[in-house]
UniProtKB/Swiss-Prot annotation:
An individual GO BP term: regulation of intestinal lipid absorption
Summary of subunit composition and partner proteins: Can form homo- and heteropolymers with other claudins to mediate paracellular barrier and channel functions of tight junctions in response to physiological stimuli. Homopolymers interact with CLDN3, but not CLDN1, homopolymers. Directly interacts with TJP1/ZO-1, TJP2/ZO-2 and TJP3/ZO-3.
UniProt KW Nucleus keyword: no
Entry keyword annotation includes Membrane: yes
Composition-biased stretches (Polar residues): 220-230
The reaction(s) this protein catalyses: Na(+)(in) = Na(+)(out); K(+)(in) = K(+)(out); Rb(+)(in) = Rb(+)(out); Li(+)(in) = Li(+)(out)
Protein name: Claudin-2
Extracellular topological domain residue ranges: 29-81, 138-162
Gene Ontology CC: one annotated term: bicellular tight junction
Cross-link (Glycyl lysine isopeptide (Lys-Gly) (interchain with G-Cter in SUMO)): 218
Length: 230
């Protein structure tokens, strides 16, 4: 039997994961300028995202420019774009499928496949979380590698942006939501319920003797025993 509370918690986490993934995908702060070494005093700070890069001047003015070409971007940026878009689409599909399979909805209430639909929604959430976690972790690894590398100039080093933190949290929310939805349905509990219903059906339909009327088998035995001794 599906746990309604576990499904509700999983669905809310899935929605939060989807919202955070979309915001992290659009934010231009995956990488921010690092103020170390000779770059401590600088008039312009840069931040880069998947779709645009921004320059923040010392006067407080921020200018953002969308990338003029997508094919000219590095391969890791293109892969991150594709994975984040696919993750958002997968999580959106998971939200729709999970609504159909949740116990608190009116869809397929008498169908045995309702719990299976919820499990499918949970699998979509897990796939969406994995697709969102891979590009975030890859960019995080690249930032840390370049930051601690002595071969990279200080002016070319970046720090972790807010979008990466949001992406990690959102992907974890999607993964936890998928696990909750998958484990909220117990196949053993469903089999036992159907078995009990099947066993109880002939007992409920069995006719009971009327008041004052002896059972049929007992009356036949009594008549046989009386006639046998006459």
């Amino acid at each position: 039997m599906a746990s309604l509370g576990l499904q509700l918690v999983g669905y809310v986490l899935g929605l939060l994961g989807l919202l955070g993934t979309v915001i992290a995908m659009l934010l231009p702060s995956w990488r921010t300028s690092s103020y170390v070494g000779a770059s401590i005093v600088t008039a312009v700070g840069f931040s880069k995202g998947l779709w645009m890069e921004c320059a923040t001047h010392s006067t407080g003015i921020t200018q953002c420019d969308i990338y003029s070409t997508m094919l000219g971007l590095p391969a890791d940026i293109q892969a991150a774009q594709a994975m984040m878009v696919t993750s958002s689409a997968m999580s959106s599909l998971a939200c729709i499928v999970s609504v159909v399979g949740m116990r608190c909805t009116v869809f397929f209430q008498e169908s045995r496949a309702k719990d299976r639909v919820a499990v499918v929604g949970g699998v979509f959430f897990i796939l969406g979380g994995l697709l969102g976690f891979i590009p975030v972790a890859w960019n995080l690894h690249g930032i840390l590698r370049d930051f601690y590398s002595p071969l990279v100039p200080d002016s070319m080093k970046f720090e972790i942006g807010e979008a990466l933190y949001l992406g990690i949290i959102s992907s974890l929310f999607s993964l936890i939501a998928g696990i909750f939805l998958c484990f909220s349905c117990s196949p053993q509990g469903n089999r036992s319920n159907y078995y009990d219903a099947y066993q109880a059906q002939p007992l409920a339909t069995r006719s009971s003797p009327r008041p004052g009327q002896a059972p049929k088998g007992k009356s036949e035995f009594n008549s046989y025993s009386l006639t046998g001794y006459v």
